[in-house]
């Protein structure tokens, strides 16, 4: 996260323990998120969009680190690969639990993620078949391939993407082409780093508001 020296004191007074001072560069103060999770990971649990909508808005960011959000239709198809989140785990959304959920996601993350001119490439090794989640906005211009074979892209988490991968090591490729609109593709790919920073800031702002 990047802030200015003038805002540094305010940030440090409001931020949780997950943020640590990192460096200063060109008049900006840099902070490292110790709860960072790499791109591309799996979950053990899922919830439906209806259940997600019933959770307090200030806790939803925490829930998204614990469970994948399915539509009812996708839950019927892909729910067999995960367990539905028990009721008691839907309310245990404390900061300490969030830290543990981040650690769990890191332990189930891709061993490789790389952007390229066509989209992005990732690799992951799974003990069992599961959905691999990417915090990239869903777009009809994406086509996904798992081990060289085209596969369905599942719209999850209110607009992000996931693909089903088998047990073992899988090679995942997302290729973007929106009706030949190269500029659109470039803009979407260039936005990925910005999206990651925004997501981290969004979580921090949510926590800040909840403390007021």
Locate each region found by the language model:
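Extracytoplasmic
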Residues: 1-105, 127, 137, 147
């Amino acid at each position: 996260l990047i802030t200015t020296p003038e805002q540094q004191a305010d940030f440090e007074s409001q931020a949780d323990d997950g943020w640590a001072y990192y460096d200063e560069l060109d008049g900006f103060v840099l902070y490292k998120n110790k709860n960072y999770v790499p791109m591309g990971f799996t979950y053990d649990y899922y919830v439906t969009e209806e259940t997600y909508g019933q959770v307090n808005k200030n806790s939803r960011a925490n829930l998204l680190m614990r469970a994948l959000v399915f539509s009812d239709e996708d839950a019927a198809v892909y729910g067999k690969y995960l367990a539905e989140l028990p009721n008691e785990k839907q309310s245990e959304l404390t900061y300490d639990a969030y830290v543990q959920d981040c650690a769990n996601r890191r332990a189930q993350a891709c061993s490789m993620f790389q952007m390229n001119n066509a989209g992005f490439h990732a690799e992951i090794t799974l003990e069992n078949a599961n959905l691999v989640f990417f915090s990239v906005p869903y777009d009809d211009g994406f086509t996904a391939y798992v081990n060289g074979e085209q596969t369905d892209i599942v719209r999850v988490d209110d607009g992000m993407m996931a693909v089903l991968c088998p047990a073992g090591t899988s090679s995942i490729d997302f290729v973007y082409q929106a009706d030949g609109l190269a500029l659109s593709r470039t803009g979407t790919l260039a936005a990925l780093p910005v999206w990651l920073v925004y997501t981290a800031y969004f979580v921090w702002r949510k926590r800040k508001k909840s403390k007021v």
